[in-house]
Design a protein with these regions (language model features):
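Flexible, glycine-rich active-site loops centered on histidine and acidic residues
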Residues: 13-75, 117-119
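Active-site mouth loops of central-metabolism enzymes
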Residues: 9-17, 86-96, 156
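Structural detector of well-ordered beta-strand residues that form the stable sheet scaffold
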Residues: 6, 36-38, 93, 112, ...
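N-terminal beta1-alpha1-beta2 module of alpha/beta enzyme domains
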Residues: 1-5
């Protein structure tokens, strides 16, 4: 009952905001106070994926307005009531690239950093997180900046064995960047 459940990341450009809100409100109804919603802005890595989602590479970026719409459905301030209604609320985390950090700061939301943002130079990484903290606009729900760091870790008896554990994931990542 103490373990939180959540999405590693719902890529918001691939979904309607009302549907995302209702899916997570249903999870919240089943597991009250234990659900987290991570929202990202990726549109799909390959052209076949973008076509399957019916989104062109040149589609307008609606992430900020869609994120705000999801937030309004979750807090009950939207013109439409997302069902089931929740009393406890579902916290939103922005899956952050450098742009995502700026959006999260403006909206007063927590961030999850990992992957690309952690791959940039250490000075840039520190600068990006410092800028998020400086630009953060406090809200009632989030009075101060909140950063979650996501790292891949492989634990084994030796370095070689740990590297071997990462091979399937590396292969899957390479394959998905090629085929979607």
């Amino acid at each position: 009952r103490d373990i939180r459940l959540g999405s590693g990341g719902v890529m918001l450009p691939n979904h309607q905001p009302l549907i995302v809100a209702e899916q997570f409100l249903m999870l919240e109804a089943l597991y009250p106070g234990r659900i987290d919603l991570g929202l990202g802005r990726s549109l799909g890595f390959t052209e076949p994926v973008r076509q399957a989602l019916r989104r062109s590479k040149d589609a307008p970026d609606t992430f900020v307005s869609d994120l705000d719409e999801v937030r309004r459905y979750l807090d009950g301030s939207a013109a439409v009531t997302a069902r089931p209604a929740s009393q406890s609320g579902v916290p939103i985390f922005v899956l952050a690239t450098r742009t995502g950090l700026k959006v999260a700061a403006q909206l007063g939301l927590p961030v999850v950093v990992g992957g690309p943002i952690l791959g940039i130079g250490s000075t840039d990484r520190v600068e990006a997180l410092d800028e998020y903290r400086r630009a953060f606009r406090a809200t009632d729900a989030h009075p101060e900046p909140y950063v979650v760091v996501s790292l891949e870790v492989a634990v084994a008896d030796s370095t070689d064995a740990a590297r071997e554990l990462l091979i399937p994931e590396a292969y899957a990542l390479a394959e998905s960047s090629r085929t979607g």
